[in-house]
Amino acid sequence: MNNLVKLTISQAVSGLKNKEFTATDLVTAHINQMDKYRYINSYITEIPELALQAAKKSDFLIQNNQARPIEGIPVSIKDLFCTKGILTTAASKMLQNFTPVYDATAYSKIINAGGIMLGKGNMDEFAMGSANINSYFGNVINPWKAESDDVDLTPGGSSGGSSAAVAAFMAMAALGSDTGGSVRQPASYTGTVGIKPSYGRCSRWGMIAFSCSLDQPGVITRTVEDAAIMLEIMMGYDEKDSTSLNAEVPNLRSAVNQPIKGMKIGIPYDLMENRSLSSEIITMWQNTINLLKDHGVEIVSIGLPYINYALPVYYVLSSAEASSNLARYDGVRYGLRVEGKDSNINEIYELSRSEGFGAEVKRRIMMGTYALASTNINSYYIKAQQVRRLIVNDFTNSFNKVDCILIPSAPTAAFPLNSNQDDPVTMYLNDILTIPASLAGLPCISIPAGFSANKLPLGMQVIGSRLDEYNIIKISSAIEKALNLKFIPKGF
């Protein structure tokens, strides 16, 4: 079969089961694709030999009718997840030589279900960024190009390597992480599907911490059905994670292609007045609303009065937690160690952290340390926690009236890779639409729903009430099916 890399996961699972091709064929095709498009820089570490060994095992299991749910499916794993015996760097010089002695739970669930890791996906250092320009291992390039020029575009961040790999057919799915939009925003920029479950649905065990009250594993695929397949595998209680929820895992795949007539979708119309949103994004939003109306969905106007405070709240809280979490990288226990002339402990701390962390990570640590200082904690950290509760209440009140909420995933289409690099506030605004749901711990999905004038993909976001991943799959699947658009980068 030609074009194995362009199959969906559900198609590939069916093809493997019917002996139309082998797992070795499928993995080899993806390795060849990785070789062909290495300039995209999607991977930090590639493991083709190990992947082919795993493919042989999958072929044996398939041959003996012992196939697991995603037997033989090639995946990318964000380099934030610990992988036993395989380099795990968090895209930082600080961890450039770190090899874990255990596997992250989310990763092991995928492997135990038959998934085959092709390599570790590039990302913003310690998951801090929205353009994948903060990696010690170089920028990731979006496979998409604007129709008007050949300028390299950002794939989004922090899971930019993950989204680029899936968009460029270098993986059928990618395990990512989402703290303030790091799965959904890259999906929006690359014409892929990115889903973040409710906080606590997927174990954080073995995922290098950025902001513990916000971090959550997520997944990037090319279809809603594939996202449902992968997320269902990843979800479930884990006693090793104190924030893990002991809740029943729903049959997410069954939500695909379900009728949506009679469902209620909330629209915060005030958000359309936000000057950060491009006219193309607002047009896509309005078109999606009309599409849902045509399918019998009731559109309800809702108010989210505190949503405009989400961005500053997020950067105070996430930076505060990051300054605490990253204190462990001191050059003594593990990670980069730099010794000076005197080699006293304070000098080792200072030199190791100065050389090991990149500029954006240092900026976040400084912001967090400032917010937690005894003179500032009441004005910044405590106040941010209080406003976070108001944002949660906004969503709770809205979900008393609607099943899901519909807003865009990003304020614009993908932008040039080298623009705004020296303007952190402008870069932070890229997450303005994804952060609110993260602060509330809600499940949300980004699906490609239109194109810009320059033929770049635009993403639409469906937000569900807590633990209601089922309905966001249901709505997004209906939108995907009704649009029936192909999101394939030019030349692929």
UniProtKB/Swiss-Prot annotation:
It is an enzyme of class 6 (ligase). One of its GO terms (cellular component) is glutamyl-tRNA(Gln) amidotransferase complex. Its EC number is 6.3.5.7. Disulfide bonds: none annotated. It catalyses: L-glutamyl-tRNA(Gln) + L-glutamine + ATP + H2O = L-glutaminyl-tRNA(Gln) + L-glutamate + ADP + phosphate + H(+). The active site is at K78 (charge relay system), S158 (charge relay system), S182 (acyl-ester intermediate). Keywords: ATP-binding, Ligase, Nucleotide-binding, Protein biosynthesis. Pfam families: Amidase (PF01425). GO terms for biological process: translation. One of its GO terms (molecular function) is glutaminyl-tRNA synthase (glutamine-hydrolyzing) activity. It comes from the Bacteria. Belongs to the amidase family. GatA subfamily. Allows the formation of correctly charged Gln-tRNA(Gln) through the transamidation of misacylated Glu-tRNA(Gln) in organisms which lack glutaminyl-tRNA synthetase. The reaction takes place in the presence of glutamine and ATP through an activated gamma-phospho-Glu-tRNA(Gln). NCBIfam families: gatA. PANTHER family: GLUTAMYL-TRNA(GLN) AMIDOTRANSFERASE SUBUNIT A, TRANSAMIDASE. Heterotrimer of A, B and C subunits. This is Glutamyl-tRNA(Gln) amidotransferase subunit A. It comes from Orientia tsutsugamushi (strain Boryong).
